[in-house]
Swiss-Prot record:
GO cellular component entries: histone acetyltransferase complex; nucleoplasm
Zinc finger feature spans (C2HC pre-PHD-type): 252-286
Database matches in PROSITE patterns: EPHD, ZF_PHD_1, ZF_PHD_2
Subunit and partners: Component of the HBO1 complex composed at least of ING4 or ING5, MYST2/HBO1, MEAF6, and one of JADE1, JADE2 and JADE3.
Organism: Mus musculus
Name of the protein in its database record: Protein Jade-3
Gene, per the UniProt record: Jade3
Region Disordered, residue ranges: 1-40, 543-585, 601-631, 651-676, 756-823
Molecular-function GO term, any one: zinc ion binding
Taxonomy, superkingdom: Eukaryota
Tagged with keyword Transcription: no
Similarity annotation: Belongs to the JADE family.
Bias (Basic and acidic residues) ranges: 549-562, 781-809
Organism classification: Eukaryota, Metazoa, Chordata, Craniata, Vertebrata
Function: Scaffold subunit of some HBO1 complexes, which have a histone H4 acetyltransferase activity.
Length: 823
């Protein structure tokens, strides 16, 4: 049936017919097979929406319709989905299926199977907790057992059953527990002590004794502080006992704004600091966050340092923050709690704008100040407070003593009988016996109370917290020490590593320099480089000499002694400065090395000058005897083996002087001192040339054993080869001096013929291992002198015959090398 739809303001509704049954297949995809099409179960009806619409021209009460302002209006025009055939709606059918029970095989549990009965299934198992809870804390003594036997006899005569010992112990324990609990409750509450509070008691915050409905005065059951509900922020008075904030936590804190403890206190936001509510109200910088609950205390950090520095005029303490007198000309400072205790005038003024102003006055400006003086009033006030406190304490102690004496009034027999499931008649006998026994023990309990009942639960928790804090603090200190030790150890190891690296670099540079000098053939003259190598060991040779050799060498040793002693006696000024040469290996080439000290160069020159005065010269090359000073100068610069060989040739010669020997003069050399060769080359090469000249002029005796000196020949040949070459080069540069005056020849002969009466010259700088004082001693009279040669020194200082012959042959072609060497 179609209904006429009134005109609607909707454009989309006018275009559509009023009622249309549209199949839901229009909004679905058509089936591929037309035979499979089924009738739709739902249709979209638009007449329901159109019937609800009201035209704009229709006047209707505004309360009877709703204005449709949704922008989703076009979607409403599509219609409402309704079933096509409501009569053919299928009815659901259901059936209940029983749950299938899962079958599981038995699996042995890891733990033992325990029975729920109190008796243990296994004889070895014991539950310690249950056993401790079931164990009675009271043990019967002999008096209790005797009284129990008498009671059982009386109960048997009266027709009651007997009481065993375990039952009596448990009954006495229950009586003690009830007495302890009721006594603690009586001590904590006002009713138990029976203290009647005075009517003139005042609030600890506002100091007002008045109370009104909804703002009653509340007392703390532990510290007995009195506060108004509004002053302390108590929204609802709890039933039973009430404790203040500090008593709830079981602490007795110190106020941060004054030196007093106790009273109506609240915490800061952190909960670590406490302050009196009165102090927070009277100090202008401090405020309270929530006025309804009067907590927490805030803005303590806003107090200026000048207020913290004030000293209280009443308690004379510089603790906390003080307030000052409201009189502008007065600057007297005092604590808020000190002002309350001394009865100063503290006014609270309410302005018209509901603003509260606090006015405080000192002793001088207070209107209700006492007539007594300040000192007298202070002593009087202290006396009154101490008296009131003592009276209050004595009253409380008296009430406690009365409560302890009347302990039996705190226990009800009916409650004990109900808990023990016994008759009141039987429990009454045990109750009377317990009362008599406790009175005989000065009203002390028969069993000690438990630690939880004696100390409470709050205080041990607080102590445990402080203990843990101390433990963590000590742990942090220990960890800090460990960290410091680890840092110091790491720093020490780093320093050691850097030091080792520096030493390694130094060693590497030293080795590099030594390798460079070795490859270039330079001498190791640096003290730091020489410290890396130790000097070669000293070699001492003991040779056996035949008697004929010592006899043949008399003349030679005599002449040698003359030559050795003549420089020391003729030139004493020169003997003070003996040349010192650095150590050199045998195979070192003769080169100008810049590291030689200047002193050694000059000493070599002086040695060459003094040596030229004592040498003889002829046209043919003949062996010459060197001076003792030359050996002393070279003893420190040659190896020990070479020194022994050269020194032996001096000590043991052929015993003959050349007939044509002449004393050389140095005048010609001094005249030609500024020749073609520079002073630096002269001073560095003269010392090497002297040794080469010595080796060429030394005769070699044929009666020395070859077997003892064979190992010296090879090294001596190499040294001679290297020393002869610079001598040849110097031969072409310097001309020898042949003109010698007759006066100088005569002076030289006198020196040769002069007998030596003392030992040979020795250096005063130190010990010389190459020349012994007994090597050149002479004994005799007149021109004939018999030398005394030690066997040990002669054996040590004789070179081989072959080496001396070869050296003499090589140096034979250079007759003027010695004179050129003196430059």
């Amino acid at each position: 049936m179609k209904r006429h739809r009134p005109v609607s303001s909707s454009e989309s509704s006018d275009e559509c017919p009023s009622t249309s049954f549209t199949s839901s297949s229009m909004y679905r995809k058509k089936s591929k097979n037309p035979k499979e099409q089924k009738k739709s179960a739902e249709v979209f009806r638009k007449d329901l929406i159109s019937a609800m619409k009201i035209p704009d021209s229709h006047h209707v009460n505004p309360d009877s319709y709703y204005l449709f302002t949704d922008t989703w209006k076009e979607e409403w025009e599509k219609g409402v989905q309704v079933p096509a055939n409501p009569d053919s709606v299928p009815t659901p059918s259901l059936r209940i299926i029983s749950e299938k029970v899962k079958e599981m095989l038995f699996v042995r549990p890891r733990k033992y199977i325990r029975c729920s009965s109190p008796e243990s299934a296994e004889p070895g198992y014991i539950n310690t907790l249950e056993q401790a809870a079931s164990t009675c804390r009271y043990d019967l003594d002999d008096m209790d057992i005797f009284w129990l036997q008498e009671l059982n006899e009386d109960l048997g005569e009266m027709g009651y059953g007997p009481i065993d010992e375990t039952l009596m112990e448990k009954t006495i324990e229950v009586l003690e527990r009830h007495c302890h609990e009721n006594m603690n409750h009586a001590i904590e509450t006002v009713e138990g002590l029976g203290i009647e509070y005075d009517e003139d008691v005042i609030c600890d915050v506002c100091r007002s004794p008045d109370s009104e409905e909804g703002n009653d005065m509340v007392f703390c059951d532990k510290c007995n502080v009195c506060v108004h509900q509004a002053c302390y922020g108590i929204l609802k008075i709890p039933e039973g006992s009430w404790l203040c904030r500090s008593c709830v936590l079981g602490i007795y804190p110190q106020c941060v704004l004054c030196p007093k403890k106790g009273g109506a206190m609240k915490t800061t936001r952190t909960g670590t600091k406490w302050a009196h509510v009165s102090c927070a109200l009277w100090i202008p910088e401090v405020s309270i966050a929530c006025p309804e609950r009067m907590e927490p205390v805030t803005k303590i950090s806003h107090i200026p340092p000048s207020r913290w520095a004030l000293v209280c005029n009443l308690c004379k303490l510089k603790t906390g923050a003080c307030i000052q007198c409201s009189v502008k000309s007065c600057i007297t400072a005092f604590h808020v709690t000190c002002a309350f205790e001394h009865g100063l005038e503290m006014k609270t003024i309410l302005d018209e704008g509901d603003e509260v102003k606090f006015k405080s006055f000192c002793l001088k400006h207070s209107q209700n100040k006492p007539k007594l003086g300040d000192a007298e009033y202070h002593h009087h006030r202290v006396a009154e407070q101490s008296q009131a406190k003592s009276e209050k304490t004595s009253l409380r102690a008296q009430k406690l003593r009365e409560l302890e004496e009347e302990f039996y009034t705190l226990v009800q027999v009916e409650d004990v009988a109900k808990e023990m499931e016994l008759s009141a008649f039987t429990v009454d006998f045990i109750y009377n016996y317990w009362k008599l026994k406790r009175k005989s023990n000065f009203n002390k309990p028969l069993i000690p109370p438990k630690e939880e009942e004696e100390n409470g639960l709050v205080q041990p928790k607080e102590e445990s917290i402080h203990t843990r804090m101390r433990m963590f603090m000590h742990l942090r200190q220990d960890l800090e020490r460990v960290r410091n030790l680890c840092y110091m150890i790491s720093r020490r190891e780093k320093l050691k590593l850097s030091h080792t690296k520096v030493q390694e670099q130094i060693f590497g540079l030293q080795v590099q320099l030594i390798n460079e000098e070795i490859t270039e053939g330079l001498s190791l003259t640096n003290a730091l480089e020489n410290s890396l190598f130790y000097p070669p060991p000293r070699i001492t040779l003991k040779l056996k000499m035949p008697k004929s050799t010592s006899e043949d060498c008399k003349d030679s040793s005599t002449e040698t002694e003359h030559q050795l002693s003549s420089p020391g006696s003729s030139s004493p000024g020169h003997s003070k400065r003996s040349p010192q040469m650095p150590e050199e290996p045998l195979d070192m080439n003769v080169k100008i090395y810049p590291r030689y000290p200047l002193e050694s160069k000059s000493n070599c020159l002086q040695t060459s000058r003094s040596h030229s005065r004592c040498e003889t010269k002829s046209s043919s090359p003949t062996p010459r005897a060197p001076s003792a000073e030359f050996y002393h100068g070279q003893s420190l610069g040659k190896p020990l083996a070479l020194q022994a060989a050269l020194h032996g040739q001096v000590s043991i010669g052929n015993g003959k002087n050349q007939p044509n020997s002449r004393v050389s003069s140095s005048n010609g050399l001094e005249g030609n001192w500024s020749g073609n060769i520079t002073q630096k080359v002269n001073s560095s090469e003269v010392c090497y040339d002297q040794e080469s000249m010595l080796s060429s002029h030394l005769p070699s005796p044929g009666n020395i054993r070859k077997s003892s000196m064979e190992h010296f020949s090879r090294s001596f040949k190499e040294a001679t080869n290297t020393w002869v070459k610079p001598t040849e080069d110097l031969q072409y540069c310097v001309k020898p001096t042949k003109n010698v005056s007759s006066k100088e020849q005569l002076w030289g002969r006198q020196l040769l013929r002069r007998p030596t009466g003392r030992a040979s010259y020795q250096e005063t700088d130190g010990y010389c291992p190459d020349l012994e004082p007994s090597d050149s001693e002479a004994e005799g009279e007149g021109s004939k002198e018999t030398p005394r040669v030690k066997r040990e020194s002669s054996d040590r200082e004789n070179p081989s015959h072959d080496s001396a012959r070869e050296c003499h042959g090589k140096t034979k072609t250079h007759p003027h090398s010695h004179s050129s060497m003196q430059r």
